[in-house]
Design a protein with these regions (language model features):
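N-proximal, solvent-exposed amphipathic alpha-helical segments enriched in charged/polar residues
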Residues: 7-25, 31-73
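Extreme N-terminal, non-catalytic leader segments
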Residues: 68-135, 381
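Walker A/P-loop phosphate-binding motif and the immediately C-terminal alpha-helix
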Residues: 133-168
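Phosphate-binding loop that captures ATP/GTP phosphates
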Residues: 156-218, 225
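Switch II (G3) loop of P-loop NTPases
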Residues: 209-220, 231-255
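Conserved catalytic-core segment of NTP-binding enzymes
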Residues: 241-242, 248-349
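C-terminal boundary of histidine-terminating zinc-finger modules
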Residues: 349-360
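A short, charged, Gly/Pro-tolerant segment at domain boundaries
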Residues: 369-372, 382-413
Length: 414
């Protein structure tokens, strides 16, 4: 039984995890009838209260309970605080920070979490250093996919894990601009692998780092697909819990290559509530289903505009579109993001409000969605697609017969 969980698990030595902001998500937790203990109560009684709270706790991130996903958990008492040590399979610093506040109020003594996140690969693959690859897609352009991908990556970092981003939009790369790395060039320590560039702890690679803005990338599908494959496989990625892949809009060669050649753990579909965007989002979901690539959920961007003066929400592109598509596709609606000028301004400047201090409302939204994505990936554990990468497109088979280096590939584009 869960009540015996603590007595059966030894303390796991772990690193401290500090949340940056209290996020309102865990208000969905089950209410606890246990009264707050008075200062006269013993520390042992306080420990019991914490145990009962954790046993009963439920939220969007922990629908089955906190202890159902905790590999190890222990409560230790010191003169100043209770320390809950735990081993968790996905990052959730923001929610743990709120739990610390709730438990501190409950027992009238400081409560803190000391956790280690042990993210494991959902699929086995041969790409060194990367545990899970998440594709961020959209059925059409102009829905804010790339901006969402970047802020989602920063949100995952803020929640406590190591993240990279790969720009798969060979024809219109935007990641260099969004990260403030425009004009930067990758280096190589061995002449074979490229070192990813870094922005505020986010490792990044894009064809935009290799091709000048003034030079159009005029490549046919097979060459673009090969370029993407080499960007992925010939980058010396650090140890990453998640690699976010910003895919080009639509359902073309790059999407098929990614789904069939690369061990993607799951895909996210970005849409707006507008009908014309929803139609294309449905097509994107259908494509992923046909190639047996699991869809983790839908993120609805530009859901509403909030008036800066009175706070009124205006639904400029309609309402409920993302939810309808999610219900039809039987996939979660992971979050709804506003149409906010601050998002656009930061994107143009090449910075993110999440890295500047995660206490704002927008940072809360992106971090909450990041938690939902990480949790959904863990709960889904979808193993339907092949566990090893395999080239299946005839053009790619012929083009890789005489394999060239990344440097050779991009010199061909000049």
């Amino acid at each position: 039984m869960l009540s015996n969980f603590f007595s059966k698990n030894k303390l796991f030595k772990s690193k401290s995890s500090k949340g940056d902001a209290a996020i309102s998500e865990s208000s969905q937790a089950s209410s606890i009838s246990e009264p707050a203990i008075n200062e006269s109560h013993s520390e042992t009684e306080g420990k019991k209260v914490i145990k009962r709270f954790l046993i009963a706790y439920r939220s969007v991130t922990f629908p089955l309970g906190f202890l159902c996903v905790t590999a190890s958990c222990d409560i230790q008492i010191s003169k100043k605080e209770y320390v809950i040590s735990a081993l968790l399979p996905f990052p959730c610093d923001g929610e743990l920070h709120e739990l610390e506040d709730k438990l501190t109020d409950l027992v009238h003594k400081k409560v803190s979490f000391s956790v280690e996140y042990q993210v494991v690969p959902v699929r086995q693959h041969r790409i060194k250093g990367i545990k899970n690859i998440i594709a961020v897609s959209s059925g059409k352009g102009g829905v804010g996919k790339s901006t969402t991908a970047v802020n989602l990556a920063y949100g995952l970092i803020a929640e406590g894990c190591n993240v990279g981003i790969l720009d798969a939009d060979i024809y219109g790369p935007s990641i260099p601009t969004l990260l403030g790395l425009k004009g930067e060039k990758p280096t190589s320590h061995d002449g074979k692998l490229m070192n990813p560039l870094e922005s505020d702890g986010l490792s990044a690679m894009s064809i935009g780092f290799l091709v000048d803005d003034a030079n159009a990338t005029v490549w046919r599908g097979p060459m673009a697909s090969r370029a993407f494959s080499q960007l992925l496989n010939e980058t010396d990625w650090p140890e990453l819990d998640y690699l976010i892949v910003d895919m080009p809009p639509g359902t073309g060669d790059i999407q098929l290559t990614l789904a069939q050649q690369v061990p993607v753990a799951g895909a996210l579909v970005i849409t707006t509530p507008q009908d014309i965007a929803l139609v294309d989002a449905v097509k994107g979901i259908s494509m992923f289903e046909q190639v047996q690539l699991p869809v983790l959920g839908i993120i609805e961007n530009m859901s509403y505009h909030q008036c800066e003066s009175c706070g009124h929400h205006s639904s400029l592109f309609g309402t409920g579109g993302g939810e309808r598509v999610a219900n039809t596709a039987k996939t979660p609606l992971l979050g709804q993001l506003p149409l906010d000028i601050r998002i656009r301004e930061d994107a143009d400047r090449g910075c993110s409000f999440i890295t500047k201090g995660s206490a704002g409302e927008l940072a809360h939204l992106y971090r909450k969605i990041a938690r939902h994505v990480a949790a959904q990936l863990y709960y889904q554990l979808d193993m339907r697609s092949p566990t090893t990468a395999e080239l299946i497109m005839p053009e790619l088979k012929s083009s890789t017969a005489n394999k060239s280096s990344a440097a050779d590939l991009f010199s061909e584009a000049k």
